[in-house]
Amino acid sequence: MSYHFNKIEEKWQKYWADNQTFKASNDSEKPKYYVLDMFPYPSGAGLHVGHPLGYIASDIYARFKRHKGFNVLHPQGYDSFGLPAEQYAIQTGQHPAVTTENNIARYREQLDKIGFSFDWSREVRTSEPDYYKWTQWIFIQLFESWYDQEAEKSRAITELEEIFTSEGNSRINAASDDDVEKFSADDWNACSEDEKEQILLKYRLTYLAEAEVNWCPQLGTVLANDEIVNGVSERGGYPVVRKKMTQWSMRISAFSERLLQDLNKIDWTESLKESQRNWIGKSVGAHVDFKIENSKFKIGVFTTRPDTIFGVSFMTLAPEHELVEKITTEDRKEEVQAYIEASAKRSERERMADVKTISGAFTGAYAEHPFTKKPVPIWIGDYVLAGYGTGAVMAVPCGDQRDHDFARHFDLLIPNIFENVDVSQEAYAGKEGTVIANSDFLSGLEYKEALNKVILELEKTGQGYGKTNYRLRDAVFSRQRYWGEPFPVYYVNGLPKMIDEKYLPLKLPEVEKYLPTETGEPPLGNATDWAWDSKNNKVVSNKVLKQSRKLSGQHDEPNSNVTPSAVEGSDDNGIYPLELNTMPGWAGSSWYLFRYMGAGNPDRFVSEEAQKYWENVDLYIGGSEHATGHLLYSRFWTKFLYDRGWLTVEEPFKKLINQGMILGTSAFVYRLEGENVFVSKNQINGNNVQPIHADVSLVNSSDELDIEGFKKWRPEFADAKFLTEDGKYIVGREVEKMSKSKYNVVNPDEICQDYGADTLRMYEMFLGPLEQAKPWNTAGITGVHNFLKKLWKLYYDGEEFFVSDEKASADSLKTFHKTIKKVTEDIEEFSFNTSVSTFMICVNELTAQKCNSREILEPLAVLIAPYAPHIAEELWEKLGNSESVTTAKYPEFEEKYLVESMKNYPVSFNGKMRFTMELSLDMSKEEIEKTVMADERTQKQLDGRTPKKVIVVPGKIVNIVG
């Protein structure tokens, strides 16, 4: 009987759905195991063959753990808020909820076809109100919390208020804004409620603050660093500028040390841990204050090398530094302003990466050196970032190469403070063994001695102190978008108030347009019903508000700095404006792993019982590109929820594996610069051409372009001319990321239709190690498909299903147990590609051995089930089993079947091998010698002679001498 994979796969996919085969229980005596994939954003393009790679790997492992007796939670859902759906809505007028629903239906169809063992009863969607109700709830808890740095934990804001009431803030060590001033209990108690709230905002774990953000005017929103590529938005390629806006921020910086130290508690790759370590960026040094001449201001800097303080010859501020405008002299203002505007067009990543371009502007102001009291010129330069440290550096050109380059470029002094070191051509960054010179009380001291001494002196004179600094900055949490979680916030006298938890979720309102308003407000400014009735706790019409809402950060003009105090509600009727921004894409993904544990719970984001049972994720699989985004934010929120008693774990993911990409083979056509003429690859010959991606479906296996199809594909190419080679247009080829934008995607639906889902699953694993990038190549897929056909034939005698109850041969038992051992080890080490090879060898050997024994073939169906579940289910049923193969116990490896009982001994005469004899490994030396000597072949070789001696090495050789 033929292997009808389409019918088999459709049959078992329906069976799994109808019987909820993979539904996990929260009440089980089995040990738990939680396997999770990074959930997908449901784009309109659907899945390509690169997307399922990690899902297949996690599914193999989830199925394996079920066979091993674990209660496995393997859920799936959708990260369904996001910018792409909003952009599509802007272009088409279609509501993002509609396109998202359509896209999810398409994703679900594709995922089901591949045969994943997901527990769909726990599906979550971040854009559903019953889900984002709890995202809003977590936001409120963050707002109602502060961070106790001494206890290293989050605490309720009410506890902080009690401390302020009894003793002020002089004795607490709390994470706060930099501009917090000391006050007594009397000072606090004398404050009005609004004044108290303004102070508390400086301590809350989510707070309103002015921040430098990446603003994209065309998209009308703030973008995260990872949403910008080469200074333009990743989506759309629009220009991005740096701009100050008042935004909601998360005080993640308070958790820096815990985020750093707890990396030692989790099983992640070292490269990913290192990415987070670098992002958190711990450094130890000193804070130094430089007074500004003829001014009340001073500049605070953080430096890891305070021992080099006598080498300071100028200071550099970030162009965005708040003091720049205040200290710039009249004659320098025009140049400084021009430089600030130019810098705003470059992203922070560009500025950090560009070490060759040297630029800056002199402010005309001078600082006073803390020890020499000499004037130090103050410059601005975009190599200094406003968000790192204090946004200012004490420039030591002899000890820092960027300072050295800057000084040489602008002809500034380069004083040398290192003994026996030449710094005329380049800076010297050495530490150990370095002797400080020309540095007053530090001269003659080595690095560490000088470091400690200068910190003591700074502290003694009140000009600085020792400090540990972190690169990690508080995370901007506002987005000027429609399709995101609404903030559960309304404003009274410009101050934020939280909606009572009982009235969550605050649902997204309907709007006519998804673009910012004409006055620059975010899209929610288009809503007609978007005010909060605080007496009746419901959303009402905006018309009752006294003024138009002008929430901060909702204006197109650069450097907009309208604060929430501009928002006025009605004191008479208790109706107030709601926040117009929405939350960022990472809000819903920061806690979704816990919602899966008890999805649908209306009373808690996760029940205590469910969370205590499942704890956290045992295995998480997803891309390494999320190292400093989602993975860091999720760790932050988990620690916060743990601190406040809502979780029993401090880390979300125990083990993390980053799958590599499946790469596509792109096709390129070459257009002559300035013309609509395309030159075949081998006829470029030095012409200036522009490579353009062509859809790979228009190219055959010989790299020939379907010219007529290409003309119809894109309207702008309809009248194009083609310079061909013998009538053929040959495209260029390049292996790169598989992406819709590169027109090189391969649809998994087609593979499933032509070869089957089991073939797709095994082939994706066969391509190479899970963590490595690998090109997609359909050339090898027929080999995997033929292997499954061969597996199928093992269970058949001609057209009849036939499995014998006879005892398996020793050879077949050896083959099978060797396979069990290798495949089990491979799965446990996530080496899935070598497992597929092992299965192929196994089936080839069993076929050659004509094995049809149930003793082998029944457990073989279980062994291969994690990889090829559909064919395994079908064979398992044909073997007479009534339950799903998923319930079967995993085959156990038995060493005895691999132990050799016989040995093929080479028999030599005077060192020359003449024949072999198969003898039992249990035989003694004497028995071996006696048996060999009695053999007629031995007697023929001796020809009547008596040998001088017989050398027997048990298990190896027999050598007859003489």
UniProtKB/Swiss-Prot annotation:
Enzyme category, top tier: ligase
Alphabetically ordered keywords of this record: Aminoacyl-tRNA synthetase, ATP-binding, Cytoplasm, Ligase, Nucleotide-binding, Protein biosynthesis
PROSITE patterns in alphabetical order: AA_TRNA_LIGASE_I
Catalytic reactions on record: tRNA(Leu) + L-leucine + ATP = L-leucyl-tRNA(Leu) + AMP + diphosphate
Record-listed E.C. numbers: 6.1.1.4
InterPro entries reported in the protein's UniProt record: aa-tRNA-synth_I_CS (IPR001412), Leu-tRNA-ligase (IPR002302), Leu_tRNA-synth_edit (IPR025709), M/V/L/I-tRNA-synth_anticd-bd (IPR013155), Methionyl/Leucyl_tRNA_Synth (IPR015413), Rossmann-like_a/b/a_fold (IPR014729), tRNAsynth_Ia_anticodon-bd (IPR009080), Val/Leu/Ile-tRNA-synth_edit (IPR009008)
Motif 'HIGH' region, chain ranges: 40-51
Renumbered ranges of motif 'KMSKS' region: 737-741
Listed GO MF terms: aminoacyl-tRNA deacylase activity; ATP binding; leucine-tRNA ligase activity
Pfam families: Anticodon_1, tRNA-synt_1_2, tRNA-synt_1g
A single GO cellular-component term on record: cytosol
Source organism, top-level taxon: Bacteria
Localization, UniProt: Cytoplasm
Region of interest called Disordered, as start-end residue ranges on this chain: 548-570
This protein's record includes keyword Nucleotide-binding: yes
Binding site for ATP: 740
One GO biological process term: leucyl-tRNA aminoacylation
PANTHER family reported in the protein's UniProt record: LEUCINE--TRNA LIGASE, MITOCHONDRIAL, LEUCYL-TRNA SYNTHETASE
Similarity section: Belongs to the class-I aminoacyl-tRNA synthetase family.
HAMAP family xref list: Leu_tRNA_synth_B
Protein name from the UniProt record: Leucine--tRNA ligase
Protein's organism: Christiangramia forsetii (strain DSM 17595 / CGMCC 1.15422 / KT0803)
The encoding gene: leuS
